[in-house]
Amino acid sequence: MPKSKVRKKNDFTVSAVSRTPMKVKVGPSSVWFVSLFIGLMLIGLIWLMVFQLAAIGSQAPTALNWMAQLGPWNYAIAFAFMITGLLLTMRWH
């Protein structure tokens, strides 16, 4: 019976081209970005507090009458501001 040839085993080496690129380290976020997401969260909180404390009830000021007419949409608006600010914190370095 003929003998099969033994193949030479090559050592596996990673070529420089096939390596996955490393992430470039980014510096800290700018001041305007931090103030933006903190501001959005605070606007949402203030919106919710003003609606709960001042715009509901028979003694609501006439200046906040438009807010009382929005009704439950005030919760959606306030939470939209807060969630947008929260989502921006995920981009913070």
Curated annotation (Swiss-Prot):
GO CC annotation terms, alphabetical: plasma membrane
Taxon lineage: Bacteria, Bacillati, Actinomycetota, Actinomycetes, Mycobacteriales
Topology, Cytoplasmic side: 1-30, 91-93
Keywords annotated in UniProt: Cell cycle, Cell division, Cell membrane, Cell shape, Membrane, Transmembrane, Transmembrane helix
Family per similarity comment: Belongs to the CrgA family.
Protein name: Cell division protein CrgA
Membrane topology, Extracellular segments: 52-69
UniProt subcellular location: Cell membrane
Subunit text: Interacts with multiple cell division proteins such as FtsZ, PbpB (PBP3, FtsI), FtsQ, PBPA and CwsA.
Domain of life: Bacteria
Pfam families linked: CrgA
Function: Involved in cell division. Plays an important role in septal peptidoglycan synthesis and cell shape morphogenesis. May facilitate the recruitment of the peptidoglycan synthesis machinery to poles and septal zones and coordinate peptidoglycan synthesis at these sites.
Transmembrane segments: 31-51, 70-90
Entry membrane topology: Multi-pass membrane protein
GO annotation terms (biological process): cell division; regulation of cell shape
